[in-house]
A protein has these predicted regions:
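Hydrophobic/aromatic residues in alpha-helical transmembrane segments
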Residues: 46, 50, 95, 99, ...
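Transmembrane helices of ABC transporter permease
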Residues: 24, 28-41, 84-87, 151-206, ...
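Helix-loop-helix
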Residues: 60-61, 169-183, 253-326, 332
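Short intracellular "coupling" helices and adjacent cytoplasmic loop segments at the cytosolic face
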Residues: 2-7, 104, 112-136, 140-142, ...
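ABC-type nucleotide-binding domain
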Residues: 347-594
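Membrane-integrated ABC transporters
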Residues: 1-46, 58-80, 95-99, 103, ...
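Alpha-helical segments in transporter systems
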Residues: 27-52, 77, 81, 96-100, ...
Length: 594
């Protein structure tokens, strides 16, 4: 990505955040801005009225005729100043409250947008992006944006108004001294901008490497058994060290250089303070200013450091926030899955016949995975798909579920319904899957079994399904039975028991189309037999596609498809394909001999 494109993204991201921040709740925003303006005006007026109080004392003390001090005038100006500072306190607190509410709403909206976006992304987004990086964008980056808004939100706006108010008041007191102060600001700001450009690049690297570390940790946690089995701990540790070192370097550079900004701003502010103190003293001697004016001006100069430093600090913090914001909007701007046809049916019961007509598909244009495939599957048929890695087995079933869209050709159901004539939700209500990688969510076994059900079922129907799929056999031995809490990360269930759960889940859905990824290699013989029986019951009367890894399990398939490089090279029953003595016979013989 070019530098120009990056700048465009950064500006666009920041504008979108401002729009979200200011216009999500216009009433709260208006109240916040009103409170900030009142607070800034009160802050600007306070020193001036204290100067009036000082002048009243100095004038009385220097009066050659009478040395009486008019305390009533002094206390009047002091009382006015106190009221102003009280107003400043209340309005500042209100602005902070409104700001916190707006930031919370903004964070909530950002998280909602990201969550909604994740469900609208096509499957290839998750196939081509690391899951750790996606998690980092949805958690770490949003948290960082919220932190940036908290540190650079209302305070930044307040500091701007405060600076403007102080400049106006200083100009009213003495425009020459005010000009010196105003000249120093752009010089300091220009230097801060130069530093911040470097800081932003390092913050972008920092959040990128944070995503990489998350991916590394996710892989090591999910596959820790395999890593230990093959003695690859050192490899993971070394990869983590490398990424951690890169994260350290980018973070250190960003923070080290960023830490220059505030001291540098203070240096220019203190330099301005010295010039004002000397210039003011000379003007008091010459009678051009009163002592109260100098006191007020010096107080403005000293207070000038606070908003100026806050603005400098906010600008530095903003670089980290914008870097995270770019990553969030990069996710939000990713291309969605293809839109549904306006007339697509939201409810339809498929009978199970599927007709692939001249279907072609590729993830990338230069590499075709499926080319001009023609296939007719009758209702209730069991179709087994065999072939080597990359042959197109999984791609074929992904096309049936519309996880991917065909590039060319059509998929027709029941001789009359084209796949795009149904909404994705409607299509998938007719399909159930039993995958090689079983998945359960945190909840009770009962809730997991009913996951995805769109209809009410009776307790008797539920228990019958559990008995038919042998789930009741092991759940009944658990102390809490179907109320036992399980999760994907922590569970007392074996791999085979989890597979039986997913089979029962599919059984309860009562689909007319099944997709089965053969997954019995990691279980014992007894459990494998139960899984096979449960699958046989599940397949009864349903069209099923079985991604087969062991050819001995698909002898009874109605149709066996042998795929190579996206093409169906052989098609027929087990006996027919063996008789042809082709690719299938070679695969079968190889497995039999092994």
């Amino acid at each position: 990505m070019s530098t120009k494109q990056k700048k465009t993204i950064q500006k666009g991201s920041f504008k979108r955040l401002l729009k979200l921040f200011f216009f999500k709740n216009k009433m709260l925003t208006a109240l916040m801005l009103f409170s900030i303006i009142i607070s800034a005006v009160a802050t600007a007026l306070g020193p001036q009225y204290l100067g009036y109080a000082t002048d009243s004392i100095v004038q009385d003390m220097s009066n050659p005729v009478s040395s009486n001090i008019h305390w009533d005038r002094f206390f009047f100006w002091a009382w006015i100043s106190s009221v102003i500072f009280l107003i400043q306190f209340v309005s500042k607190w209100l602005s902070a409250w409104f700001s916190t509410r707006i930031i919370s709403d903004t964070a909530k909206e950002l998280r909602s947008q990201v969550e909604t976006k994740l469900w609208s992304l096509p499957l290839n987004y998750f196939d081509t992006n690391s899951h750790g990086d996606i998690m980092s964008r949805t958690t770490n980056d949003i948290d960082n944006v919220v932190t940036t808004l908290n540190s650079s939100g209302a305070d930044t706006i307040y500091s701007i108004f405060q600076l403007v108010g102080m400049i106006v008041m200083m100009t009213a007191i003495n425009w020459r001294l005010a000009l010196i102060t105003v000249i120093i600001i752009p010089v300091s700001g220009w230097i801060v901008t130069l530093i911040s450009r470097f800081v932003r690049k390092e913050y972008q690297k920092q959040w990128y490497y944070t995503g990489m570390i998350n991916s590394n940790v996710e892989e090591s946690v999910n596959g820790h058994n395999i890593v230990k089995l093959y003695g690859q701990e050192e490899k993971f540790v070394e990869a983590f060290r490398k990424q951690n070192r890169l994260l350290y370097e980018s973070s250190f550079k960003a923070m080290a250089v960023s830490n220059l900004i505030q001291p540098l701003s203070r240096f220019f502010t203190n330099l301005n303070y010295v010039i004002v103190a000397l210039g003011g003293a000379l003007r008091v001697i010459s009678g051009q200013m009163t002592v109260g004016d100098v006191q007020a001006f010096i107080q403005y100069t000293r207070q000038f450091q606070t908003p100026f430093s806050k603005l400098s600090q906010a600008y530095s913090s903003l670089q980290s926030g914008i870097a995270s914001l770019d990553r969030i909007y990069e996710l939000l701007d990713s291309e969605d899955q293809a839109e549904e046809k306006p007339e697509a049916r939201a409810s339809y019961r498929l009978q199970g016949k599927i007709d692939f007509r001249d279907v072609s598909f590729s993830y990338v244009p230069e590499r075709k995975l499926i080319e001009h495939m023609n296939l007719v599957v009758e209702p209730g048929q069991m179709v087994a798909i065999v072939g080597g890695t990359g042959a197109g087995k999984t791609t074929l079933v992904n096309l049936i579920e519309r996880f991917y869209e065909v590039n060319i050709g059509e998929i027709i159901f029941d001789d009359k319904v084209e796949i795009h004539d149904l909404t994705r939700a409607c299509l998938r209500e007719n399909i159930a899957m039993v995958l090689q990688d079983t998945w359960v969510y945190k909840g009770t076994i009962g809730d997991n079994l009913k996951y995805g059900l769109k209809r009410e079922i009776t307790e008797e129907e539920f228990r019958n399904a559990c008995r038919e799929t042998f789930v009741d056999q092991f759940v009944s031995t658990l102390p809490d039975g179907y109320q036992t809490v399980i999760s994907n990360e922590m569970s007392s269930l074996s791999a085979g028991e989890k597979q039986l759960l997913t089979i029962c889940r599919a059984f309860l859905v009562k689909p007319n189309i099944l997709i089965l990824d053969e997954a019995t290699s990691s279980v014992d013989t007894r459990t494998e037999a139960m899984i096979d029986q449960a699958l046989d019951k599940l397949r009864e009367g349903r069209t099923s596609f079985v991604i087969a890894h062991r050819l001995s399990t698909i002898r009874n398939a109605d149709v066996i498809l042998v795929m190579e490089n996206g093409h169906i090279v052989e098609q027929g029953s087990h006996k027919e394909l063996l008789a042809q003595n082709g690719a299938y016979a070679g695969l079968y013989q190889a497995q039999f001999e092994s």
